[in-house]
């Protein structure tokens, strides 16, 4: 089946089975961050991930997006378990199937805006349209020039570059870690609406956020508590999310 120009194995974008993640502390001590999480998310879904600090939100996103292998359990993205791929195929998979918006932007400071945005396209052998890049950045209220070094930009402007890079790649699945965190209220709304539109086009979007108002406009909210999904709320309201988060603090 095809949607939005890309081929889907079926309508399931990401399927997680009994995922747990532990980290080693010292020689003989481990800490459990994620505990027996199972989840299935379809194309066209916009999923927000919320929870108090330390609940495992960013770790879950890293496991879902092929960046951090689970200690146990399975992650399948578009029909593929990325943790079974060899390094070369995994790199290709990340370039072609998914896009990641990092909380710390993950840009190349020595390169200008245009080169940062189009680097994944060049690595994949795809054509580069600088006019399309400029148009996308303009839609996000980006003020700097394409020739500006990203190291000279504010945090908010760097975030817009990182988001444009993820969107311009036209991937099937987008993983976003606090994509609106460094932005003013106007830019925050623009970024969210851009992600919302991607889901409306049939893509799958995951978003870690602390913003209850934005999360209330997603299709599904996952509330994490102590490394587990304590609640899943379909079409969440702000009141439901607030109450769920207050409960998760106990």
Where in the sequence are the language-model features?
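Conserved ABC ATPase "signature" region
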Residues: 81, 129-145
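Helix-to-loop junction immediately C-terminal to a conserved catalytic motif
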Residues: 65
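Conserved ABC ATPase signature
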Residues: 149-153, 157-159
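Conserved catalytic motifs of ABC-family nucleotide-binding domains
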Residues: 170
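Conserved ABC transporter NBD signature motif
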Residues: 73-81
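Catalytic Walker B motif of ABC-type/P-loop ATPase nucleotide-binding domains
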Residues: 174-177
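Short coil-to-helix segment of the ABC ATPase nucleotide-binding domain corresponding to the Q-loop/switch region
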Residues: 111-119
């Amino acid at each position: 089946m095809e949607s939005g120009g890309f081929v889907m194995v079926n309508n399931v974008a990401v399927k997680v089975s009994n995922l747990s993640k532990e980290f080693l502390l010292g020689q003989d001590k481990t800490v459990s961050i994620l505990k027996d999480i199972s989840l299935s998310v379809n194309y066209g879904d916009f999923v927000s991930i919320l929870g108090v600090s330390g609940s495992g939100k960013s770790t879950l996103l890293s496991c879902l997006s092929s960046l951090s292998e689970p200690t146990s359990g399975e992650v399948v993205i578009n029909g593929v378990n990325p943790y079974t791929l060899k390094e070369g195929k995994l790199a290709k998979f990340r370039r072609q199937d998914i896009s990641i918006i990092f909380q710390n932007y993950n840009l190349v400071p020595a390169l200008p805006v245009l080169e940062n945005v189009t680097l994944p396209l060049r690595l994949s052998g795809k054509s580069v349209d600088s006019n399309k890049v400029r148009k996308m950045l303009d839609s996000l209220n980006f003020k700097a020039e394409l020739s500006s070094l990203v190291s000279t930009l504010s945090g908010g402007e760097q975030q817009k570059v990182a988001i444009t890079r993820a969107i311009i790649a036209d991937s099937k699945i987008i993983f976003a870690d606090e994509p609106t965190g460094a932005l003013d209220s106007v830019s925050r709304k623009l970024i969210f609406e851009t992600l919302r539109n991607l889901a409306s086009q049939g893509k799958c979007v995951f978003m870690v956020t602390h913003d209850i108002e934005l999360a209330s406009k997603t299709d599904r909210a996952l509330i994490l508590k102590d490394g587990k999904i304590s609640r899943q709320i379909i079409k969440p309201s702000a009141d439901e999310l607030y109450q769920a988060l207050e409960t998760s603090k106990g």
